[in-house]
């Protein structure tokens, strides 16, 4: 299925890097928002998102800007091209806006734009067990867990506002059930990473790279065991093999 139950997906992004930045100045989202507002009022275009994060590297004059965003409407070559063009236009515009209106950016230069669009969400597998937001936020542990997640839900639904962040129970982590990786209707078809069967809130936590590694490992082990056994493996066998391979379950 495409996106969530309403057919919505999270915004895609393309970071860019600036050099020559005085990182002793305020690099907060609030400072970015102030600069973007001034740029918009001055008539600058291709600035849809009001703010974003500037990631600094201590002791350097380099920042990575996480601002340009676009809402995917499919994965055709035409649509991917449209998004790439739009995001690169945004990156150039945001770099110019920050240079002109944000203190500390007066001598900044655009040195790099990400090599390709970052897609947070597209199609998902319809699985046998749905991971829920409550499972994630409460740090639920379960006997059928085959991977762990610890990233808090990070929801990028708006093209104009910054992401919404929800806190996982402090000091905790949550299990991802084997059924969230298994197709509801097709034998020995598994999905991992952004394919995991999860509701909107849970998906915003499991789509990140570290958790994708864990679910990919689990899906591969489960599918291989099923191919060897000729039948669906029990979760205990999958967990045991993952632990044998030093997986954290």
Briefly describe each language-model feature range.
Residues 1-249:
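Flavin (FAD/FMN)-binding glycine-rich loop and adjacent Rossmann-like elements that form
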């Amino acid at each position: 299925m495409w996106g969530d139950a309403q057919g919505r997906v999270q915004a895609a992004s393309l970071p860019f890097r600036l050099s020559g930045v005085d990182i002793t100045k305020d690099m907060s989202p609030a400072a970015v928002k102030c600069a973007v507002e001034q740029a918009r009022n001055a008539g600058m275009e291709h600035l849809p998102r009001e703010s974003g994060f500037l990631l600094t590297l201590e002791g350097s004059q380099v920042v990575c800007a996480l601002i340009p965003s676009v809402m995917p409407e499919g994965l055709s070559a035409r649509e991917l091209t449209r998004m790439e063009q739009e995001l690169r236009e945004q990156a150039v515009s945001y770099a110019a806006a920050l240079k002109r209106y944000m203190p500390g950016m007066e001598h900044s230069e655009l040195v790099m734009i990400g090599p390709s669009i970052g897609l947070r969400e597209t199609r998902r597998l319809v699985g046998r067990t749905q991971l829920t937001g409550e499972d994630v936020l409460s740090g639920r542990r379960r006997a059928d867990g085959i991977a762990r997640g610890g990233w808090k839900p990070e929801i990028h639904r708006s093209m104009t506002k910054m992401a919404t962040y929800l806190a996982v129970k402090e000091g905790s982590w949550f299990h991802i059930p084997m059924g969230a990786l298994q197709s509801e209707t097709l034998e020995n078809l598994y999905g991992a990473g952004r394919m995991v069967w999860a509701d909107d809130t849970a998906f915003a936590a499991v789509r990140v790279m570290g958790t994708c590694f864990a679910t990919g490992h689990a899906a591969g082990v489960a599918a291989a065991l099923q191919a060897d056994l000729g039948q669906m493996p029990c979760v205990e066998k999958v967990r045991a093999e993952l632990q044998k391979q030093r997986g954290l379950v």
